[in-house]
């Protein structure tokens, strides 16, 4: 399995970047930069959530249900006429669950780092979150994952698949630089 940043460089990743950029009405290179920052942060936050039995059970249920990877089967249709509001609403729910009250802080920091305004970042994240869940769901199916106990390892492989220890440490710092569970102050130190 390759890492999440490797995915962005693949043909699928390029389709995702192009589609998200078109749907959000943002510059493709800035959208790519935003996703390069955001997706590993979201994966790391998912991994942390999956570290608790309740979090792992909830994520496993989502991956076995709505987020089974089928969204990836028709990205052209997803992006073709603009992303449906239902997809954005689902993305907002995912972000709220994964990031909680840290969501706006993460959006603000990614905005500052990418050069896109916070509203554009929020839109990019809402569109990409269900796609990211689809990527995770597809991988869990390929791995025949039936137990929520295996989730943390799989998510770690997505994050660590890039073979960048420094990058992993950076992600951990983003999510908890102050040791207080706060993402906002941690992302600010990027």
Spans of features found by a protein language model:
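A structural "flexibility-hinge" signal
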Residues: 1-190
């Amino acid at each position: 399995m390759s890492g999440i940043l490797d995915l962005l460089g693949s043909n699928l990743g390029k389709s995702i970047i192009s589609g998200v950029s078109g749907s959000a009405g943002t510059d493709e290179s800035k959208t790519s930069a935003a996703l390069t920052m955001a997706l590993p942060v979201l994966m790391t936050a998912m991994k942390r959530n999956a570290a608790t039995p309740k979090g792992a059970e909830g994520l496993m249920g989502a991956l076995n249900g709505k987020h089974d990877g089928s969204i990836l089967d028709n990205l052209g249709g997803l992006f073709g006429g603009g992303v449906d509001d239902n997809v954005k609403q689902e993305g907002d729910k995912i972000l709220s669950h994964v990031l909680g009250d840290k969501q706006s802080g993460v959006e603000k920091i990614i905005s500052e780092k990418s050069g896109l305004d916070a509203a554009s970042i929020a839109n990019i994240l809402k569109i990409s979150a269900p796609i990211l869940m689809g990527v995770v769901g597809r991988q869990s199916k390929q791995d025949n994952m039936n137990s929520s106990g295996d989730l943390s390892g799989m998510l770690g492989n997505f994050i660590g698949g890039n073979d960048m220890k420094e990058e992993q440490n950076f992600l951990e710092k983003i999510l908890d630089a102050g040791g207080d569970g706060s993402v906002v102050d941690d992302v600010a130190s990027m």
